[in-house]
Regions:
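Extended, charged low-complexity regulatory segments
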Residues: 1-179, 183-188, 689, 697
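P-loop NTPase Walker
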Residues: 2-34, 38-41, 155-158, 163-279, ...
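Alpha-helical nucleic-acid-binding subdomain
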Residues: 99, 220-466, 472-481, 489, ...
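Phosphate/oxyanion-binding active-site loops and adjacent basic polyanion-contact surfaces
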Residues: 174, 178, 208-212, 352, ...
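Short hydrophobic beta-strand that contains or immediately precedes a catalytic carboxylate
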Residues: 182, 467-468
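Amphipathic, well-packed alpha-helical segments that form the structural scaffold of globular domains
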Residues: 183, 187-194, 217, 390, ...
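Short beta->alpha junction loops/turns
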Residues: 205, 293, 345, 349, ...
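Conserved helicase motor core of SF1/SF2 NTP-dependent helicases
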Residues: 225-226, 230, 239-273, 279-280, ...
Length: 697
């Protein structure tokens, strides 16, 4: 094994290390030539303007995918095959494929079948590989490597200094990929077939978010043509989280996946109907919980279909000198047959004129005429038929329907009869009736209802694959909104029931998968933590018997590093300033996690450069968030983030800020598990009883 810590700017004395460094330089040069060839492609050679635009877009994406970041290693491993189809060959495994001028691979994509043994092979099952090599890098320069023999009887290493160093590498900036450190149990999930929906119950630090993103990258590689047509969507809990994970897929060469929040999805539906509509308020917890209840789907369906009007009289269609009649009873039968088809409201409405016209056509044939399809089409388009159809089957604006439902007590009572109690109906009604969708006081839960109503009217097109993170915090109605985006596709569901911090969130994965429309999905548990130090996760796990008694406690693989300090102080903010002087002297990122109410006082007291997570509301806006070494993090936004060093203020206030103690303890569990190297807890009030005695220093 070559030393992983060899200085990158000195000439290596190890010939093998020198050879690997030359291969890295040659591979970078080859990648540059690949990009030059892509840049030289001329879309003007296309036969027409449309083709030229398509080719130019394709070439631009190709050039972007071939961009090289000199600080990121082109490869991180090597496989030397001894048996099978690749016997005698060696392959360098990296984030993307790189080939020389003759097309021979210099680096193979980590997602290629030939790379699979890098993640799965063992001494017991070597998969044809004799040697697995891992590389150490510093700022993109190759500094060393270590070899692991997989030949039977040679004694497999179960410890990798390079692997541990990569896992523990200090974090500054947004989330990075884990492609060099994917573990076998993670890789099984990453490479699950596109047709299979998976649910990952992952304890803190098990890499569930990274696994979900790498699964998206793998599926885009393995099913590129299909998913380029159908689309891949990543749904995160908030804009700050999307900023944090936003660089992972591009770093893996994937730029085709769309990333958004659930609010982005449903508000997109609302504004597509009424461009001036916007979220203007937040619901109280009990109201939001009721609006997120699955029973609201029945209420909305009742409201949508209540618009059908029984015919008061028959249809009369003048044509030439004749007047053709469809009696009211027959029109009612036609409406009932369309309703029984089980299609969307809007689709059935579009069929009605043709069905009425066909009834007229039958009358013509019975009278001895010989009409054809052209006559039926003309009758269906005629003014009497269109007007009659519009009367029986009025158009429905989903936003106006929900606005009426939340403003009109009588309309709500009719739609919710037998579904919601009178008390629940009263809770749903807005304090002041809305006037128009563009100016209505919509909440996020209201927008979810509009999204449901819109799907009842016209089917939401399905994507090929959807990844939803922090799924445990979504209500049944929110999960239905995600699920209909993958009605004919598959999903990757990520979350941790112990970290559920919304009163409307689901309490079991079986329920969540049912709401997503994927009850057949298998739940995979990740309990081996690679990020959170052992003593930190054990301290946080004291809360599990109360917040998630059915879950297995996480086990950290990191026993040699990490630091936990719990200190009672007379005054929080002065103590924080003193602690930060010490923590900022260390290497790595620092997160100060505070109850939301303390963000202002803490920010005012800090005299060192810092950023505030969540300070930029627009996910697309430029921001220093996560680019600073020091971030102040409201507890409500801590989920999914990680920092080398975390300073957590006043757990008691953090718990008390939530609607109930259970939610507060779950929020505390989230905040306690954000640290990669050290956790310092400062408190002036007594710690919550569930944390037990203070750990010995």
């Amino acid at each position: 094994m070559s030393s992983p810590s060899a200085a990158p700017d000195t000439e290596p004395t190890d010939p093998a290390l020198a050879a690997e460094q030359r291969h890295l330089a040659d591979a970078r040069a080859a990648l540059a030539r690949m990009r030059d060839r892509a840049a030289a492609m001329d879309a003007a050679a296309a036969g027409d303007w449309v083709s030229a635009q398509y080719l130019e877009s394709t070439f631009a994406l190709r050039r972007k995918a071939l961009a090289d970041d000199p600080t990121v290693p082109l490869f991180f491993g090597r496989l030397d095959y001894a048996d099978g189809d690749y016997a005698g060959e060696s392959f360098h495994v990296g984030r993307r494929h790189v080939s020389d001028d003759e097309g021979e691979p210099m680096v193979v994509d980590w997602r290629a079948p030939v790379s699979l043994p890098f993640y799965r092979a063992s001494a017991g099952e070597p998969m044809g590989v004799a040697l697995r090599r891992r590389y150490g890098f510093l700022h993109g320069a190759l500094t060393g490597f270590e070899d692991e023999s997989l030949v039977a009887g040679t004694g497999q290493r179960d410890y990798s200094a390079i692997l541990e160093a990569e896992i523990e590498r200090p974090r500054v900036g947004p989330m990075r990929d884990i492609v060099a450190t994917i573990q076998p149990e993670q890789d099984v999930i990453v490479r699950a077939d596109l047709s299979r929906s998976v649910c990952v119950q992952g304890a803190p630090g098990t890499g569930k978010t990274a696994v979900g993103l790498h699964r998206a990258a793998y599926l885009l590689y393995a099913h590129r043509d299909q998913l380029r047509r159908q689309g891949v969507l990543v749904v995160g809990p908030n804009a700050s989280f999307l900023r944090y994970i936003g660089d992972v897929l591009p770093a893996l060469g994937e730029i085709d996946a769309r990333q958004t929040t659930l609010a982005g999805l449903v508000v997109g539906t609302l504004t597509s109907l009424h461009p001036k509509a916007a979220l203007r308020r937040e619901d109280p917890a009990d109201v939001a919980t009721l609006k997120g209840d699955e029973r609201m789907a029945t209420v909305l369906a009742n409201a949508v279909w209540s618009g059908l009007v029984p015919p008061a009289e028959g249809l009369v269609v003048p044509r030439g000198a004749s007047r053709w009649r469809v009696p009211a009873w027959q029109a009612e039968e036609i409406v009932a047959s369309l309703r029984a088809r089980g299609v969307r409201y809007g689709a059935a409405r579009a069929m009605l004129p043709q069905r009425l016209a066909h009834a007229v056509l039958v009358k013509m044939e019975e009278a001895g005429d010989s009409p054809d399809d052209r006559v039926q089409d003309a009758v269906a388009r005629s003014r009497p038929v269109r007007a009659y159809a519009d009367t029986l089957w009025p158009a429905v604006d989903p936003a106006r329907l929900v606005l009426r439902l939340l403003s009109d007590a009588d309309f709500l009572a009719t739609a919710a009869d037998g579904v919601l109690t009178p008390e629940e109906q009263a809770l749903l009604l807005w304090p002041r009736p809305g006037r128009a969708p563009g100016s209505a006081p919509w909440s996020l839960a209201d927008a979810v209802l509009v999204d449901e109503a819109a799907d009842l009217v016209a089917r939401e097109p399905s994507l090929g694959h959807v990844v939803v993170d922090e799924a445990q915090d979504n209500s049944p109605m929110m999960l239905r909104a995600v699920g209909r985006r993958a009605s004919t596709g598959s999903v990757t569901v990520l979350g941790d029931l112990a970290q559920a911090t919304t009163p409307w969130g689901v309490r079991s994965w079986a329920a969540a998968l049912a709401h997503l429309g994927k009850p057949e999905a298998v739940v995979d548990q990740l309990t081996r933590g690679f990020r959170v130090p052992g003593e930190v996760i054990e301290f946080a796990a004291r809360l599990l018997p109360l917040i998630a008694p059915d879950l297995e406690p996480p086990v950290s693989v990191r026993r040699t590093r990490g630091e936990l300090v719990v200190t009672r102080v007379p005054a929080l903010v002065p103590a924080l300033v003193g602690v930060l002087d010490e923590v900022l002297a260390r290497v790595g990122s620092v997160g100060v996690i505070v109850p939301d109410a303390l963000v202002g006082p803490v920010v005012d007291a800090l005299e060192v450069p810092h950023a505030v997570v969540g300070s930029s509301p627009d996910v697309e806006s430029a921001t220093v968030e996560f680019d600073s070494r020091l971030d102040v993090v409201p507890a409500s936004l801590a989920k999914g983030l990680e920092f080398d060093h975390v300073v957590l203020l006043e757990p008691a206030d953090l718990v008390a800020a939530e609607p109930d103690e259970l939610t507060g303890l779950r929020r505390l569990y989230v905040c306690l598990t954000r640290a990669v190297t050290s956790l310092t807890v400062l408190h002036a009030q007594p710690l919550p009883d569930a944390l037990g005695p203070v750990p010995a220093a």
